[in-house]
């Protein structure tokens, strides 16, 4: 399913994505359940992204056995750091107001360069990924998130199946997402490369 087939307002995405346990990138119940069950306060903190790389709040090996330390280190120090560096260059070249959050740029990314789109998306997606992952995850979501998953997909297992399919069938690189729609139902989709559901593309 393309995300454009299930329109989601930016406001709804921002206010509900933490509550929905926005799941990104990698698949498997161990990784998916690492997402936060908390709602609005965390959403505002998570979704006011700066234009610079935030230090990682846990050791590179903290997510093992789901993600090994070397993969985390390379991803954080090379890939994500590269997106942040190149985003900084694009921001300077295009005179972007960095006093506002990156989300404001992503919401109007069609007005900016390909460099801004690729690196702004790459930086945002990775910053979100680092913030919503935790070494102390439960086996599966609980509380409101569990109820929302069951209501939207029928069961946690059905959700995992759809999420894994979205990730595995994305040609090349990209991200799988769990988002809240206008109808307050959760849905799964994917975006190519470093695009994300906040972008007006």
Regions found by a protein language model. Give the residues of each.
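C-terminal segment of N-terminal export signals and the immediately downstream linker at the start
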Residues: 30-65
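Short, intrinsically disordered, charge-balanced linker/junction segments flanking boundaries
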Residues: 195-201
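Generic preference for hydrophobic
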Residues: 53, 188-190
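N-terminal secretory signal peptides
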Residues: 1-12, 20-23, 29-30
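Acidic/His metal-coordination segments adjacent to aromatic residues that form catalytic metal sites
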Residues: 62-66, 106-111, 192
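All-alpha RGS (Regulator of G-protein Signaling) helical domain and cognate RGS-like helical scaffolds
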Residues: 46-48, 78, 84, 89-99, ...
């Amino acid at each position: 399913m393309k995300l454009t087939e299930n329109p989601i307002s930016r406001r709804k995405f921002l206010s509900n994505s933490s509550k929905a346990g926005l799941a990104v990138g990698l698949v498997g119940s161990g990784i998916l359940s690492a997402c936060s069950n908390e709602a609005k306060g965390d959403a505002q903190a998570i979704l006011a992204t700066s234009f610079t790389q935030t230090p990682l709040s846990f050791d590179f090996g903290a997510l093992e056995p789901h993600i090994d330390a070397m993969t985390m280190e390379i991803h954080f120090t090379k890939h994500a750091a590269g997106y942040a560096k190149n985003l900084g260059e694009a921001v300077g070249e295009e005179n972007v107001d960095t006093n506002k959050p990156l989300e404001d740029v992503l919401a109007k990314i069609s007005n900016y360069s390909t460099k801004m789109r690729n690196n702004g998306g790459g930086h945002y997606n990775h910053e979100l990924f680092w913030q919503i992952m935790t070494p102390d995850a439960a086996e599966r979501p609980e509380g409101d998130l569990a109820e929302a998953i069951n209501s939207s997909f029928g069961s946690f297992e059905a959700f995992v199946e759809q999420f894994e399919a979205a990730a595995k069938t994305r040609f090349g690189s990209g991200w799988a997402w769990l988002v809240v729609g206008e109808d307050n139902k959760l849905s799964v989709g994917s975006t190519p490369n470093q695009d994300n559901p906040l972008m007006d593309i």
